[in-house]
Amino acid sequence: MKTLNFKHAIEKLGYKVEKYVYGYNFRSAFASKDNQLWYFHIEDLRDEHPFVYRRKVKSLEDYTGGSNNNDVELKLEQLGYKIVEKRKQKYDFNSF
């Protein structure tokens, strides 16, 4: 199975990344597809298998949006990909 980072995984599913947040232990993105805006989030990267979800949103500032869908990894798996996202190593105060 081929590996992709979080941002490239979203693009591989046919979305255009509009806004990307690269946090210490998480990543999130707003992306569009077929005139619909979506919010993607990969949870705590300190975990061996972090949780990935997406939901429909109304704007690039809508962090509450609709219901979470956890089908991102399954859709990628069907295409022969999996997400491998490394944490920031420098200044990661949560890892002490």
Predicted regions and their residues:
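Negatively charged, low-complexity tracts enriched in Asp/Glu with abundant Ser/Thr
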Residues: 1-24
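Residue-identity detector for threonine
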Residues: 3, 64-67, 86
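A sequence-composition feature that detects small, non-aromatic residues
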Residues: 9, 28-31, 84
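Charge-rich, solvent-exposed alpha-helical interaction surfaces
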Residues: 9-13, 75-82
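Acidic, low-complexity, intrinsically disordered interaction modules
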Residues: 19-78
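Short, surface-exposed acidic
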Residues: 19-20, 83-86
